[in-house]
Amino acid sequence: MSREAISNNELTEEQIAEFKEAFSLFDKDGDGTITTSELGTVMRSLGQNPTEAELHDMINEVDADGNGTIDFTEFLTMMAKKMKDTDNEEEIKEAFKVFDKDGNGFISAQELRHVMCNLGEKLTDEEVDEMIREADIDGDNQINYTEFVKMMMQK
């Protein structure tokens, strides 16, 4: 993808850096591509259970060159499109449920640490606390749905 195609999607350098980090979480063997197997591993770690057919569909949706895998350029295109989708409230609700393990309507530091750990992100207590602090508007040391939505919309 050309630089202008990326800039047409209006991704900031910071967003591209964040997506690079996310991409490397999916790209388990570090070969620069995401396979259906790698995608499945990450989705299962997030509590999803996609079928092989669903994984192929997800890859095919963004696999511009048709080689059966997603490279970083294709991943960026997918993320840029996702960010443009205004109808992502349902996705945000689903993401909140993934983090809110006990279903009490709040994401605690422990729940955040658990999900990040499943994603392969080993965070220190300080890093987890910092993430909570950044999103925690009312100062109760946990993230409610409204705070989560605000945080997701800022991305």
Curated annotation (Swiss-Prot):
Listed Gene3D superfamilies: EF-hand (1.10.238.10)
Keywords from the named record: Calcium, Cell projection, Cilium, Flagellum, Metal-binding, Repeat
Localization per record: Cell projection, Cilium, Flagellum
Residues where Ca(2+) 2 binds: 63, 65, 67, 69, 74
Residues at which Ca(2+) 4 binds: 136, 138, 140, 142, 147
InterPro entries from the UniProt entry: CALM/Myosin/TropC-like, EF-hand-dom_pair, EF_Hand_1_Ca_BS, EF_hand_dom
Amino acids binding Ca(2+) 1: 27, 29, 31, 33, 38
GO molecular function annotation: calcium ion binding
Main location: other
Superkingdom of source: Eukaryota
Domain EF-hand: 14-49, 50-85, 87-122, 123-155
Record-level GO cellular component terms: motile cilium; myosin II complex
Residues annotated for Ca(2+) 3 binding in this entry: 100, 102, 104, 111
Note: This protein has four functional calcium-binding sites.
Family indicated by similarity: Belongs to the calmodulin family.
Biological role: Calmodulin mediates the control of a large number of enzymes, ion channels and other proteins by Ca(2+). Among the enzymes to be stimulated by the calmodulin-Ca(2+) complex are a number of protein kinases and phosphatases.
PANTHER family: CALMODULIN LIKE 3 (PTHR23048:SF0), MYOSIN LIGHT CHAIN 1, 3 (PTHR23048)
The name this protein goes by in its record: Calmodulin, flagellar
Organism: Naegleria gruberi
Gene that encodes it: CAM1
